[in-house]
């Protein structure tokens, strides 16, 4: 009996010790896994810290060691040179890199306008450029439908949806339907007044009265006076001057404008040919340009016209 009890007790003890050992082994395995995981996390942390430190150190090194030499050469300098490209000496490049681009201001001369490229086509609009004047307010005398009008740069033509883009010495540039077109100064063939012989006009002028009777400035309608006071160049809205040509300008035919009140009030007649302006020869092509340039500062103008062989002076008050 005692042997049986002792045997059972020993078996029970062995089983109990086995369970304890198994439990201890499980705990030890768990602790080992946790230790491995802890080491892995610690290693990743130090690796990330090392990478971040390297990036920061590299950025600081680039910042403090940055030199102006890196900006002296354009990225395009590394490209292979073109066949038609000009070569530059290294000294020239170094000289350019040493310039103080934001230094003391130096006045820049107004660039001279270059001739328009040949690709700009002549306009097909039914308008004629009769004259051009330069000055503080460049203007162009343009004839539309038989009527002359003075336009400044940036203004729109009355009869067409075209804008005066530029005013040059012998032409103007128009912007029409999104395209740039050229309107050249009218040549002899564009004149609307026929002259059979320049000598005949000259002879007629010689046979005219030597000293025409000067007329006092006429009284013009109030509305016209107010318009001329604001802009004397609007006189061409009331009086049209069309060049009479025969191997050059021999005068200007005087015609009424859209509003003929000033034409009638001033005493002009159909067929009058203006040959002088303020006692200056009006047959010189530069006379019209001088007139348009001086108009803003004039208080009155005096036109000398030929009428049936006689000369008549007609004065017009602009203010």
From Swiss-Prot:
Residues 66-319 are periplasmic. Interacts with outer cell membrane protein GspD2 in the periplasm. This is Type II secretion system protein C 2. Residues 1-42 are cytoplasmic. Belongs to the GSP C family. It is found in: Cell inner membrane. It is a single-pass membrane protein. GO terms for biological process: protein secretion by the type II secretion system. Pfam families: T2SSC (PF11356). It comes from Escherichia coli O78:H11 (strain H10407 / ETEC). NCBIfam families: PRK09681.1 (NF007242), typeII_sec_gspC (TIGR01713). The chain crosses the membrane at residues 43-65. Its main location: membrane. The keyword 4Fe-4S does not apply. SUPFAM superfamilies: PDZ domain-like. GO terms for cellular component: plasma membrane; type II protein secretion system complex. The keyword Protein transport applies. Keywords: Cell inner membrane, Cell membrane, Membrane, Protein transport, Transmembrane, Transmembrane helix, Transport. Encoded in a type II secretion system (T2SS-beta); this strain encodes 2 T2SS but only this one (beta) is expressed under standard laboratory conditions. Involved in a type II secretion system (T2SS, formerly general secretion pathway, GSP) for the export of folded proteins across the outer membrane. InterPro entries: PDZ_sf (IPR036034), T2SS_GspC_N (IPR024961), T2SS_protein-GspC (IPR001639).
């Amino acid at each position: 009996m005692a042997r049986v009890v002792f045997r059972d007790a020993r078996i029970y003890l062995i089983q109990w010790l086995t369970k304890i050992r198994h439990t201890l082994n499980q705990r030890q395995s768990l602790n080992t896994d946790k230790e491995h995981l802890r080491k892995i996390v610690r290693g990743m942390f130090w690796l990330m810290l090392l990478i971040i430190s390297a990036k920061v150190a590299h950025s600081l090194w680039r910042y403090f060691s940055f030199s102006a030499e890196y900006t002296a050469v354009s990225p395009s300098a590394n490209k292979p040179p073109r066949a038609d490209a000009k070569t530059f000496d290294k000294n020239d490049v170094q000289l350019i890199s040493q310039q103080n681009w934001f230094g003391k201001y130096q006045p820049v001369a107004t660039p001279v306008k270059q001739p328009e490229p040949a690709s700009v086509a002549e306009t097909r609009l039914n308008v004629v450029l009769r004259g051009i004047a330069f000055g503080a307010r460049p203007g162009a005398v343009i004839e539309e439908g038989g009527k002359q009008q003075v336009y400044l740069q940036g203004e729109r033509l009355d009869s067409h949806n075209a804008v005066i883009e530029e005013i040059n010495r012998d032409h103007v540039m128009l912007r029409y339907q999104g395209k740039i077109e050229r309107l050249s100064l009218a040549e002899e063939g564009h004149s609307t007044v026929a002259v059979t012989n320049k000598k005949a006009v000259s002879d007629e002028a010689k046979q005219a009265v030597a000293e025409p009777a000067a007329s006092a400035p006429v009284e013009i309608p109030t509305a016209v006076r107010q318009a001329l006071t604001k802009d004397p160049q609007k006189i061409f809205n009331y009086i049209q001057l069309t060049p009479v040509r025969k191997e050059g300008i021999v005068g200007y035919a005087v015609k009424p404008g859209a509003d003929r009140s000033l034409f009638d009030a001033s005493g002009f007649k159909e067929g009058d040919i203006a040959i002088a302006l303020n006692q200056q020869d009006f047959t010189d092509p530069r006379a019209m340009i001088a007139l348009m340039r001086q108009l803003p500062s004039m208080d009155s103008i005096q036109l000398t016209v030929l009428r049936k062989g006689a000369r008549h002076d007609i004065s017009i008050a602009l203010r």
